[in-house]
Amino acid sequence: MTYTFGIELEISGLSQQETRSGLLNRNIKGFKVVNDDSHGVTAEIVSCPMAYGMDAMEQINKVSNALQDMGATIMSNCGFHVHISNAPLMDGVDANDWTRKSIEHFENTGNYYSENLSDPMDAVLIKDVMYRYTKMQNGYNGINSMLPRSRRDMTMARVLVLEKIEAANTIRELQSATHGKFSTINLQPWTTHGTIEFRQAAGTIEADKILHWVRFLLNLIDHSANYRIDQSASREIQHNTPTQPFRRGARVGVQYTMMRAVDGATTRQIMDATG
């Protein structure tokens, strides 16, 4: 499956107008320049959605070269965010053709292209992605080993809590398991933009670093979808409850045991049993 993506590059050293004019003069399409209130960030470059392929790689190389040519710099607190669509391209849709249509649509309307997308991934898949990313956070060759110290458990991308992810079974519960927008994986755009935002990467205007990180995230999702999730099986999540968390014989314990039974219990049955 091919999931589309978009990038957000925070830079320093150039004003928004300078950046906007520089991209326009170089005829670079598919990007807009917006304000960012983070300290030391003077402009943020936001791409339209793209599907990974030669056309997307070419656009990212163009904007990278342009920013370097214009004299953009990166401060230690600059970030690089990646939005990945929660829905893959439909079967048979060419990635390069989709990217070209997305850029054209963005240039003509200022809006993001969302045609030819399949059904969104379900909670089981995104939960596995969040679990694996968080599980890999520390340790040898973990996420943190790829990032400078300034991007490790920082306030703009707080590390998720593994136990909260494990306890979540729905998209809403997974959203609640994060720290909101300022999380390593932000699920707030799920309903507003149909994307998952990965916020932890360090700021960069080097195309190789941008593309490597995008590929890493896309591979993370692909591996979960293709090798860890049984696509043919029921997506019902089993959640085991404790046999008896209450004092034996206590009224609440009797109620709990009755409700935990396979067929549950009616209100009348519980009232008859407990008085």
Positions of predicted regions on the chain:
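Basic amphipathic recognition helices
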Residues: 206, 253-256
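Short helix-capping/hinge SLiMs at alpha-helix to coil transitions
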Residues: 259-262
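A generic structural signal for well-ordered alpha-helical surface patches
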Residues: 215-218, 253, 268
